[in-house]
UniProtKB/Swiss-Prot annotation:
Name of the protein described by the UniProt record: Small ribosomal subunit protein uS17
GO molecular function: rRNA binding; structural constituent of ribosome
This protein's UniProt keywords: Ribonucleoprotein, Ribosomal protein, RNA-binding, rRNA-binding
Signal peptide stretch: none
Cellular component annotations (GO), alphabetically ordered: cytosolic small ribosomal subunit
PANTHER family: 40S RIBOSOMAL PROTEIN S11 FAMILY MEMBER (PTHR10744), SMALL RIBOSOMAL SUBUNIT PROTEIN US17M (PTHR10744:SF1)
SUPFAM superfamilies: Nucleic acid-binding proteins
Keyword rRNA-binding: yes
Source organism, top-level taxon: Bacteria
Record-linked PROSITE patterns: RIBOSOMAL_S17
Stored CDD domains: Ribosomal_uS17
Native organism: Endomicrobium trichonymphae
């Protein structure tokens, strides 16, 4: 049996939980510009599959790359790292 390649993991913050079993997660990364030697920040939004609807807006979550689940969903929720307090 063939082994799967190494999967990518990201940590981000849930920015939308309006859809059932689907979350929008914003992932921020920092990198240094090669020419100007300045630290830059960039954000990416990922559409994530949340099978049990356990995450909510503001939660910090860990996501993993997976096979395509729909037109935009290619990531799956692995765990909720830090929950926000319910007000």
């Amino acid at each position: 049996m063939a082994e799967r390649g190494k999967r990518k993991f990201r940590t981000g913050i849930v920015v939308s939980d309006k859809s059932n079993k689907t979350r929008q997660v914003s992932v921020e990364r920092t990198y240094r510009h090669s020419l100007y030697d300045r630290v830059l920040r960039s954000k990416s939004k990922f559409i994530v599959h949340d099978e049990k609807n356990i995450s909510h807006v503001g939660d910090t979550v860990k996501i993993m790359e997976s096979r395509p689940l729909s037109k935009m969903k290619r990531w799956v929720l692995v765990e909720v790292v830090n929950k926000t307090s319910e007000i």
